[in-house]
Amino acid sequence: MPEGLFFFAKFSILKTYCLLQGTILHPKTIVRYAVELTSYAIFDMDGTLLCSTGMWDHVTDRILAKYGKTITHEQRMANMTLTVEGTAAMFVQQLGVPLTEPECAELIRAEARYGYAQEATVKPGVEQVLAAMHARGVRMCVASGTETPLIEAALTSHGLMRWFEFAVDCKNPDGKKKPDVYLDALHRFGVQNPVQATVFEDSPVGIATARAAGFATVGIYDEPMAEFWPQITQTADFASRTWQDWLQNVQQTGPVPPQISMKL
């Protein structure tokens, strides 16, 4: 399929075209067409590919318990989108962990390596989705708030890294509150315009950021983030409770109608 086709594979464009042509399609069907037409897929890791959001809670709890510190629910939620350095800064500055920030960051990395190897699991259906997208020629990468060496180690240990061309991490402590990591991933593909890519996320912050930057977005349910599911379903272009459901929905849609493909 020509590269130019993917440039216009976006919900708003498909919807507008269908309205102009008098074609009646359910919004979710239009979104599935947009996802079918994407040529680049950018995946979050924690809570999206791996059941590891809860693992990070364990990392936090083990470190804080060691120093007799506690964390509020609000602080825990805010921590979800931070980098290792951002988390270390929170632990030291806000929670009073008696370490320097670099020392705390190294402790977090050590605990995370253990957690990914011993506690994290692959979310059901992920392998099938990656295989299906690979078969369609979709180029894939991972963009995470977790550092690249940890991403690669975690995905390699679970047999997933082979599907991805590369992994990128957030370079600013605010993590996915800014679109830098998604744009970095896009540019690594050699692409400039976000409408050519779809971002898969479990975080409402990540989804909102990616969507505002122009990416198509798919929200994936993750139990530790359940309280944010209503927000995710309202913000993401498409949302699915399981990877199996998402894949089934796309497969059931069938081929994109020729008149839409040709117009795009």
Regions found by a protein language model. Name each.
Residues 1-7, 17, 22:
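Positively charged N-terminal leader segments that act as targeting/secretion signals
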Residues 4, 17, 27-39, 131, ...:
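Asp-based, Mg2+/Mn2+-dependent phosphohydrolase catalytic module
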Residues 26, 33-128, 134-136, 149-152:
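N-terminal helical cap/lid subdomain that shapes the substrate entry/recognition surface
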Residues 49, 140, 199:
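Conserved SAM-binding loop
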Residues 70, 139, 216:
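Residue-level detector of anion-binding/catalytic polar loops
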